[in-house]
Amino acid sequence: MELLSSILVFFAGLWAGTINAVVGSGTLVTFPVLIALGIAPVTASISNATGLVAGNAAGAWGYRKELKGRGRQLLRLLPASLLGGISGAWLLLHLPEVVFHYAAPALIVLALLMVVFQPRLQQWVRAREENPEHALKDKSHGLLLVVLVYLAGVYGGYFVAAQGILLVGILGVFMTGTIQNANAMKNILVLGVNVVAAASYLLFAFGRINWAVVAIIAVSSLIGGVIGSKVGRRLSPPVLRGVIFALGLVALGFMIANLLK
């Protein structure tokens, strides 16, 4: 990989690691850059997901205080995330590559919509927290919650982007606690999905992984995860969403252009 390309990937990984620790959707930063550099979509997806594991781990560790008292809930939900991640990775590796070419733009649009509507979702969750009727009972035992976490894992294993936003919304609605508690649990569940997905890629798609990309994103996202867990929460959410949305549109443009060739 050329020096300029490596620098671009490094800073994309740094920003993605920071964003993932705070709001999720870091893949909407790294994925467009990899596509713009001419890397095939599936190779870009699996290399990106593998590299971001380090950043996920850093973000999860940084939010460990917000996990206090959530151990039992995590033990109930983590298996669903892991199974979902394996399912999503299997779909990515076994469906024809042309499916990903057509599915990725639609998934990016879905992820961008989640980014755009995130503030309203968070306002709704906060309103529930302040309503005593919704604070009386923790609904984490519900089968629906487990199913939704599994489906978010499938989505994450197939296409990493914005699974964090999905999970924050799901956890915020179905469990008691604050947004920060939901975000901390999200970091653990996303880490689980990405670990099992990366393991699947290592076992069954080793030759399709771009290891230069993995190494650069691993180092830079690790640094970004530390930054995000410490000071990233002080950054303006509108600015973060604006950057994510702009880069997501770039990715969408590249993909549509490739489809029209």
Regions found by a protein language model. Give the residues of each.
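Selective hydrophobic functional segments
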Residues: S47-A106, V195-P238
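Residues within membrane-spanning alpha-helices of integral membrane proteins
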Residues: S6, A49, A104-I108, L112, ...
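Transmembrane helix exit motif
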Residues: A57-K68, A106-H134, L252-K261
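Hydrophobic alpha-helical transmembrane segments in multi-pass integral membrane proteins
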Residues: S87-L91, V149-F159, V196-F206, A251-K261
